[in-house]
């Protein structure tokens, strides 16, 4: 279940994928292909102009990424990022992108079948991150206007259709302060944050991933996707090791907690710290914010240190409630 293996290989090289998407009509962040050495990286960075982003070609989850402010920083950062990428992905190749600042991380959830049908299930705002790892997602983004949304969805569905891709996938963009969208990468899988899109649209994406793999065509089109209301997801992460003594999950309409936790679950330091995803939906963003605050207060995970209190502080922050946050949010706390 999932995309064709050839597509997975083709789309996994982020540097090469940018060229594919540029030819398909999307604006891509200026940058390089895969680099062969730190010396080549220095030449590319000088040409692009500092600051630049150094990224793993096969990367994901915030690994193998460095912000480089000057030539003096580059060589050591190159070796560190290459080693990190090799360890995490089995591929140490890197590429350089122009650093866009300030920016928001906006991604589009796509479904495409083998018959050429492509549908976008709206955007997610994933700008609340620490060390390039997402903490909270919401849909729709408070920063994207209806006119921008319509244009972005139209361009993205047309571009993905040209590639012949089939399956669930996510197109990731940076939105600059002028409101331009710059393509970064594509994830050829169902992402952690797909739940928030399911809550907004009512579409079971796991079911459709299975149906697409079985050769079933999409039975809905773009005109059937209604992006009304607001959904917010908080990632609940472990902050240390422990054994779960008690779990209390918040209830109520349009409240969802996806987790594998049960009493007695032991959390070790050897795996991803994600414990669960708390997701809420409401007809208005203001009400969704009130609902996620109440749900965070009600959620109890006893015996394991978590980031619940931190998530509560985030959703109570004026920059979040006003919708004016960007990728620097956690740096300025």
Which residues are covered by each model-predicted region?
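Short acidic loop-to-helix transition motifs that present clustered carboxylates
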Residues: 34-40, 101-103
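ATP-dependent carboxylate activation and anion-phosphoryl transfer catalytic cores
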Residues: 24-25, 48, 56, 61, ...
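Residues within well-ordered alpha-helices
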Residues: 16-17, 41, 295, 310
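Conserved beta-strand edge residues that scaffold enzyme active sites
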Residues: 7, 34-35, 59, 174
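Short acidic active-site motifs
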Residues: 40-41, 73
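A short, GP-enriched loop/loop-strand-helix hinge that lies immediately N-terminal to
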Residues: 1-12, 27-33
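Conserved thiamine diphosphate
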Residues: 16-33, 142-143
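Acidic/histidine-enriched active-site and ligand-binding environments that engage anionic O-linkages
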Residues: 43-53
């Amino acid at each position: 279940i999932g995309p064709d293996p050839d597509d997975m290989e083709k789309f996994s090289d982020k540097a090469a994928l940018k060229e594919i998407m540029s030819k398909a009509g999307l604006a891509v962040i200026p940058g390089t292909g895969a680099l062969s050495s730190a010396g080549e990286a220095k030449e590319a960075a000088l040409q692009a102009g500092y600051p630049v982003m150094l990224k793993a070609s096969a990367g994901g989850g915030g690994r193998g990424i460095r912000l480089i402010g000057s030539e003096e920083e580059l060589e050591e950062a190159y070796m560190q990022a290459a080693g990190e990428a090799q360890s995490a992905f089995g591929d140490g190749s890197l590429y350089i992108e122009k650093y866009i600042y300030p920016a928001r991380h906006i991604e589009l959830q796509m479904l495409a079948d083998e018959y050429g049908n492509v549908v976008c299930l709206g955007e997610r705002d994933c700008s609340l991150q620490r060390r390039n790892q997402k903490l909270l997602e919401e849909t729709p983004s408070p920063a994207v206007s209806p006119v921008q949304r319509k244009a972005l969805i139209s361009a993205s569905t047309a571009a993905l259709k040209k590639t012949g891709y089939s399956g669930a996938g996510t197109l990731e963009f940076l939105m600059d302060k002028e409101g331009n969208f710059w393509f970064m990468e594509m994830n050829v899988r169902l992402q952690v944050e797909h739940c928030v899109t399911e809550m907004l649209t009512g579409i079971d994406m796991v079911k459709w991933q299975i149906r697409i793999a079985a050769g079933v065509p999409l039975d809905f089109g773009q005109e059937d996707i209604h992006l009304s209301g607001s959904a917010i997801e908080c990632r609940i992460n472990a902050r240390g090791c422990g054994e779960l003594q008690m779990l209390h999950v918040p209830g109520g309409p349009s409240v969802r907690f996806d987790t594998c936790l049960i009493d007695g679950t032991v959390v070790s330091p050897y795996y991803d710290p994600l414990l669960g995803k708390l997701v809420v939906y409401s007809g208005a963003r203001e009400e969704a914010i009130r609902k996620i605050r109440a749900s965070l207060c009600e959620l109890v995970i006893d015996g394991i240190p978590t980031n619940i209190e931190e998530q509560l502080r985030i959703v109570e922050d004026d920059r979040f409630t006003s919708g004016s946050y960007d990728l620097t949010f956690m740096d300025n706390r």
